[in-house]
Amino acid sequence: MSIRKKNFVIVWLANFFVSASTTMIVPFLSLYIETLSTFSNGFVQRWSGYVFGITFLMAFLVSPFWGRLGDKRGYKIILMATGTGIALSILFMGFVTSVYQLFFLRMAMGLVTGFIPTSLAMISAQTPKGSAGKTLGTLQMGQVSGSLFGPLLGGMLADRFGFTYTFFITSFVIFSSVLLVLFGVKEQPLAEKTAKRTPYTRKEVLSFIFHQPALWVMMLLTMLVQTGNFSIQPLLALYVNELHGPVNLAFFSGMAFSATGLGSLLLARKWGDLGDRYGHRRILIGLLLAASIFFIPQALASSLSVLLVFRFLFGMAMGGLLPCITAAIRVQAPGSIQGEILGYNVSFRFLGNVLGPLIGGIISSHFTISAAFYVTAFLFFAGACMLWIMQKFRKDSYAKAS
C-alpha cells in the first residue's frame, strides 16, 4: 500500500473515532448540567445553549490559525496537538462541579477543534486535483459515520455507566486516535512547500482570497449551507413532537437526525466523483436546488413518516455539498497556503453552525417551526442562484477576454 493510501485509511479511521467521540456527549449535555446543582428549567435551557454554542464560536475564531500553522509546521503535528487538546478537555469535563467550569472547558475544546479540518487539509494536499472530490467525499463518509453512531452510543454509555465515565471513555477513544496518527501517518513533503521562497503573510493570503471570487463565494456558500442545516436541528425534536406526540420522542427524534446522516453517507463519495468528472460547481448548483426542494415538503409534513422520507432525501443532497465545496477550493488554492485557506473556510463553516440555531430559533419563536423550514429552503435556493450568477459572470468575462 502506498504512503498516500495508508495515510488516507488511517486518517479516515481517526476521523470516524473523533467525530463519534465528540458527538457522544452532545445528547446528554443539558442533562449533565442539571446534575451540577438545582437549577430552573430556564437556566438549564439557556446554559445548554451557551455550553453548546461556545465551542463553535471559538472554533470559528481560531480555525485559520490551525490552518496556517499546518502549512508552516506540517499537518501531522497539528493533528496530534488538537486531538490531545480535545481529549484532555473532555476528560476534565468529567470532574467539573459547576456549569461555569463546563462552559470554560467547552470553550477550551473550541480552541483546539482543529483535528477534522486539519485532516481534511492534509488529505487534500496529498490528493491529485482530478480526484479531489471523490477522495474528500470518501473522507467525509468517516466523519458522517462517526456522527451517526456517536449520539446513540453516547446515550447508551451514559445510561449504563453514568455521565462521568462516558466522558472518560470518550477521552480515551480520542487519545487512541492521536496514537493512531502518531504511529501510522507519514506526512509527505509537497513540491510547492519544499521550494525555497518567502512565506506568505496573513495579509497576502487574505488579499489572494479577496481577488479570487471563486474562493470567497465558496466560503460564503459553506456558511450558508451550515446555517441552513443547523437552523433546523435544535427544532427537530419539537417538530417531531408536533407530528407524532410525546411517545418515544427521543427515539423518533434520533431517527429524524439519523435519516439525514444516512442519506449523506450513501452518496457523499458519489457526488464527489461526479464533481471530478463534470465540474464541482455544476454539481453544487444541482445539489443546492435539490436541498431547497426537499425542505419544502418537510414544512408541509402531516406525519412523521413523510418527514423521515424527505429528511433522508435532503441528506442525500447534503452529503455532496461540503466535499464538492472543499474540492473546488482545492483546485483554486496553491498548496503552500492551502491549509490556511481551508482554515478560513472552516471558520465560515463554524460561523454557520452558530448562526443557524439563532436564525431558526428567532423565526420559529415569532412564527412557526414550519416557517423555519421555508426560510431554510430559501437559503439553499439563494446559494444555487449565487453560484449560477458567479458561473455566468466568469463565462462572460472569458468571452470578452477572448
Could you tell me what each predicted segment is?
Residues 28-45, 235-251:
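Short amphipathic helix-loop junctions that connect adjacent transmembrane helices
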Residues 1-5, 187-218, 402:
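Juxtamembrane intracellular "pre-TM" segments in multi-pass secondary transporters
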Residues 89, 100-108, 294, 305-313:
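Paired small-residue
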Residues 105-143, 328:
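Cytoplasmic helix-loop-helix junction between adjacent transmembrane helices
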